[in-house]
Amino acid sequence: MSASLFQRLTGLRVSRETYEKLDHFVDLFGKWSKVINLVANSTKDQIWHRHVIDSAQLFKLRPNPQHWIDLGSGGGFPGVITAILLSEKSDGWVDLVESNNKKAAFLRTALMETGARGRVHPVRIEEAHKSLSDCDTISARALADLDLLFSYASPWAEKNKNLNFLLHKGRDYQSEVNNARDRWTFDLIIHPSVLEADSVILEVSGLARSK
């Protein structure tokens, strides 16, 4: 993918150096994905569109995070992509939570070789709050339904009432929202995906347990 097409699809202007880091990550991903399962096989040939662009669109919504936590980082989407985009800035950090040791090893390599602003934590998601401090942004992609995600994230939400979530969801997102409202109160902004007509980014804030 060309740098100009990346900019057109995401609305993000990045330096040549940052684009080269993204390109290097894609090459690295290709090598590692031959050995370990990082994403569904059906999407490996569409890495830029299905994964890089899909992840980068979050940064347009939250361009100046101080402490971003990506839950279930897997193949690095959106965690590594966000950390690479943050490398243009003087502050901001991404903590990537991934309990699978092989995937965690890939993520560490990706962060190191791209000079991205992030760190990998090979712990279970439900235990991550014990070692990770307050954050202002949480992301998760293809991880769990909203109710379970909110349960995972509630320790951070209790500490920071201004916590924001950026969550990729598919066509059935509304049923997840409705189910989550049985146990949680929250504000919601729905952003259409830049790639998929039936996919959205849910921007959630003000999360609290229903009384």
From Swiss-Prot:
What Pfam families does UniProt report for this protein, alphabetically?
A: GidB
Organism of provenance: Allorhizobium ampelinum (strain ATCC BAA-846 / DSM 112012 / S4)
The record's section on InterPro entries has: rRNA_ssu_MeTfrase_G, SAM-dependent_MTases_sf
One GO CC annotation:
cytosol
Q: Where does S-adenosyl-L-methionine bind?
A: 72, 77, 125-126, 141
Alphabetic keyword roster:
Cytoplasm, Methyltransferase, rRNA processing, S-adenosyl-L-methionine, Transferase
* UniProt GO molecular function: rRNA (guanine-N7-)-methyltransferase activity
**Enzyme Commission number:** 2.1.1.170
Q: Which reaction does it catalyse?
A: guanosine(527) in 16S rRNA + S-adenosyl-L-methionine = N(7)-methylguanosine(527) in 16S rRNA + S-adenosyl-L-homocysteine
Where is this chain's protein located in or outside the cell? Cytoplasm
Q: Which family does it belong to?
A: Belongs to the methyltransferase superfamily. RNA methyltransferase RsmG family.
- Protein name in UniProt: Ribosomal RNA small subunit methyltransferase G
Keyword ATP-binding annotated: no
**Keyword flag rRNA processing:** yes
Described by its record, this protein's role is as follows: Specifically methylates the N7 position of guanine in position 527 of 16S rRNA.
NCBIfam families in alphabetical order: rsmG_gidB (TIGR00138)
User: Which residue pairs form cystines in this protein?
Assistant: none
Record-linked HAMAP family: 16SrRNA_methyltr_G
